[in-house]
Amino acid sequence: MRCEILSVGTELLLGDILNTNAQYLSRRLADLGIPVYFHTTVGDNPERLKKALEIAFSRSDMVIATGGLGPTQDDLTKEISAEFFNKKLVLHEESLKRIKEFFERRGLNLTEGNIKQAYIIEGSRVIPNDWGTAPGIILEEGGKILILLPGPPKEMIPMFETYVVPYLSTFSSGIIYSKVLRVCGIGESFMEEKVKDLIKSQTNPTIAPYAKEGEAILRITARAKSKEEAEKMIEGVVKEIRKRLGDYIYGEGETSLEEVVVNLLLEKGLTISVAESCTGGLISARLVNVPGVSKVFKGSIIAYDNEVKIKELNVPEEIFKEYGAVSSQCAMKMAEGIAKKMGTDVGLSATGIAGPEGGTLEKPIGLVYIGLYIRGEMSYKELRLSGDRNRIRLYTTINGLDLLRRGLLNL
């Protein structure tokens, strides 16, 4: 069965909203063994929406459309879909009852637009919406399947999981299962070179490399009759990849670099503080994304000005005179200074030239030094980054966390 995901909403075309629904649905459909062949995005325009449906059903057996089920005049997915299949819209009394109760519980007045949401395509089955007002629809017609779901992810995802997944499970023959390995410290091309022969030789499982900002990803995917069988197929491939990439692999699945770092600190019973210059708090922000970080993270100082580095971090003035603020010597002293000031086992620092001004031939834009202090031992990493200011700061943050990870692994 060929499936197509149709995302409806002018806001998606304008880039005002990130299309996370399509990403989510593609992943889940793959888990169910239903291949997605096309993604289409169309605005809230009746003619273009109808054309999108025509194209979708000319090449796909099933179309899952999200968005355009709301109460406003430009929410037309249901109406255009009914027109496409030459069907009428009919009032679904149970949905109307649920919508009325939804508004009564909140002390709100029901509008004509909300009543419109209770209409469904003739001959379709309703997908109840226990998280909002717009019910979904499943329509089987002429060997084709149309599934309509609301656009808000907080409604779409639970509706899909609760009601659509059981329906779709009857169509899947086997499953597609993937495992993701997350890599840091090497670029996508270098990583791919390390496993190039595996990528070429593997057909099931397959190995696909992807680039992510400052990181790289390897997705290993197997098609099998069951999840257990797929996991066994993947296991040997993952073992060989780990053998080749070693500690460049920092995690699996949705694990973030900062989660790995915080878990290492917790495991080793260490505390950390951070001194930041060019990153301006980005490293600290990433750390505090992790629940439970308060057990290991004591605080940070944004020491942008040299005077702050001297007074707050105890960086000797001679460092600036002899080496400058952007130097390995300064980075290490910043890391040592913050650790001693905060009374932590570990200190991490970053100093560099993020641009667009301030670079010289000797010290160009993108030159960054990351300092690491762990219980009296100091080390550093030099980076020569390219791109705009935001990219340099982001890559510095990622490399800083990775240097910290490696330092902790070596303890």
From Swiss-Prot:
It holds the Pfam family CinA_KH. Gene3D superfamilies: 3.30.70.2860, CinA-like (3.90.950.20), MoaB/Mog-like domain (3.40.980.10). This is CinA-like protein. Belongs to the CinA family. The lineage of its organism: Bacteria, Pseudomonadati, Dictyoglomota, Dictyoglomia, Dictyoglomales. PANTHER family: NICOTINAMIDE-NUCLEOTIDE AMIDOHYDROLASE PNCC, NMN AMIDOHYDROLASE-LIKE PROTEIN YFAY.
